[in-house]
């Protein structure tokens, strides 16, 4: 069955182009031109992903994401923001609110499809079984092994979960609260500074291969896992 994608975009030419590209790549697009019509599309069959413009008649994309996250049936639907707002502050705000990725207009159809597929791989249950590799660092979820080249790295279960999350969500900034929700879960009470402790332990575990540099502190915001030093 084709993956169902809700396209929330008020500019008809862009919306129609995106829907055409999605259909050509085997997706099932569903259109919404404003905030209210997008909310009305949130019913069964649920969208597998939402492409969301920042500015909408009747409300903003940020408000729409907050609406999604309040409802148990929609909070886990991945969101890719599709907007002309390209400033770092705007990107960080979108991601911190709950967007899974961010595409700045103008964009190419190939980039759009590639980013959609990347987000869907991250949320797919099958994806968690694949070995993840980045610059000589590999993580195998099945065997619970982390390697730098041919050498195994030792780390605790929480550091492993933290690294797994980072490696499946690279080049994005996450606040301590977001990391707590993703790695520890929303039903566990843990202080924000606990994240700092496990970040230090993770960096220590990654030192033998020099991969500790990939766990980067973003001052005033949180942490990012990046191959760009």
Curated annotation (Swiss-Prot):
Its main location: cytoplasm. Phosphorylated by PhoR. It comes from the Bacteria. PROSITE patterns: OMPR_PHOB, RESPONSE_REGULATORY. It is found in: Cytoplasm. GO terms for biological process: phosphate ion transport; regulation of DNA-templated transcription. The modification 4-aspartylphosphate is found at residue 53. GO terms for molecular function: phosphorelay response regulator activity; transcription cis-regulatory region binding. Gene3D superfamilies: 3.40.50.2300, 6.10.250.690, Winged helix-like DNA-binding domain superfamily/Winged helix DNA-binding domain. Residues 129-227 bind DNA. Residues 4-120 form the Response regulatory domain. One of its GO terms (cellular component) is cytosol. Keywords: Activator, Cytoplasm, DNA-binding, Phosphate transport, Phosphoprotein, Transcription, Transcription regulation, Transport, Two-component regulatory system. The keyword Cytoplasm applies. It holds the Pfam family Trans_reg_C. This protein is a positive regulator for the phosphate regulon. Transcription of this operon is positively regulated by PhoB and PhoR when phosphate is limited. This is Phosphate regulon transcriptional regulatory protein PhoB. The gene is phoB.
């Amino acid at each position: 069955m084709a993956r169902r994608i809700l396209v929330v975009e008020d500019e008809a030419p862009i919306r129609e182009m995106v829907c055409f590209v999605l259909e050509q790549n085997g997706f099932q697009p569903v259109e919404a031109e404003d905030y209210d019509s997008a909310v009305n599309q949130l019913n069964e069959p649920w969208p597998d992903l939402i492409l969301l413009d920042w500015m909408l008649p009747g409300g903003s994309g940020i408000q729409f994401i907050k609406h999604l996250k309040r409802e148990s049936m929609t909070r886990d639907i991945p969101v890719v923001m599709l907007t002309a707002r390209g400033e770092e502050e705007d990107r960080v705000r979108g991601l911190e609110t709950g967007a899974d990725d961010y595409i700045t207009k103008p964009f190419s159809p190939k980039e759009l499809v590639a980013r959609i597929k990347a987000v869907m791989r991250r949320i797919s249950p099958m994806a968690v079984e694949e070995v993840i590799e980045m610059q000589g660092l590999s993580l195998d979820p099945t065997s619970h092994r982390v390697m730098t080249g041919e050498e195994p790295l030792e780390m605790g279960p929480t550091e492993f979960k933290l690294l797994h999350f980072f490696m499946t969500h690279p080049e994005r900034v996450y606040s301590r609260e977001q990391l707590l929700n993703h790695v520890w879960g929303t039903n566990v009470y843990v202080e924000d500074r606990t994240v700092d402790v496990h970040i230090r332990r993770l960096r220590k575990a990654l030192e033998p291969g020099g991969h500790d540099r990939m766990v980067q502190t973003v001052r005033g915001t949180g942490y990012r896992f990046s191959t760009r030093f």
